[in-house]
């Protein structure tokens, strides 16, 4: 039997992605949005779609989306900008609750 050559396993690089909310004039145009990123959610009633796109080419993509005829406005998600360390908030809330209990 031939010996099996060991191939080098390349690491999986996770690209940074960001949420983009695209508000449309009608529901018909939302099918075309899959060209620009991964369509995660589409609302027929509110006429908006949620896309996830790579963070690298965000500025070019936003200008392309705004130029489409059926697009009303484009918003970028801000979850990366928020502080996701909630331990301090919990500690402050616990102190406030303890102070209220002591007052009673």
Swiss-Prot record:
Pfam families referenced in this protein's UniProt entry, alphabetically: DUF2129
InterPro entries: DUF2129
Keywords from the UniProt entry: Cytoplasm
GO cellular component: cytoplasm
Subcellular compartments: Cytoplasm
Domain of life where this protein originates: Bacteria
Keyword Transmembrane helix: no
Family classification: Belongs to the UPF0298 family.
HAMAP family assigned to the protein according to its UniProt record, in alphabetical order: UPF0298
Protein name: UPF0298 protein YdgE
Record organism: Lactococcus lactis subsp. lactis (strain IL1403)
């Amino acid at each position: 039997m031939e010996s099996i050559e060991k191939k080098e396993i390349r690491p999986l690089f996770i690209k940074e992605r960001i949420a983009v909310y695209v508000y449309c004039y009608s529901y018909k145009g939302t099918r075309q949005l899959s060209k620009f990123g991964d369509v995660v959610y589409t609302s027929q009633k509110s006429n908006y779609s949620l896309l996830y796109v790579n963070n690298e080419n965000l500025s070019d993509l936003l200008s392309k989306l705004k130029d489409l005829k059926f697009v009303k406005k484009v918003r970028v998600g801000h979850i990366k900008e928020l502080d996701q360390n909630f331990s301090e908030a919990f500690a402050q809330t616990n102190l406030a609750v303890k102070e209220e209990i002591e007052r009673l």
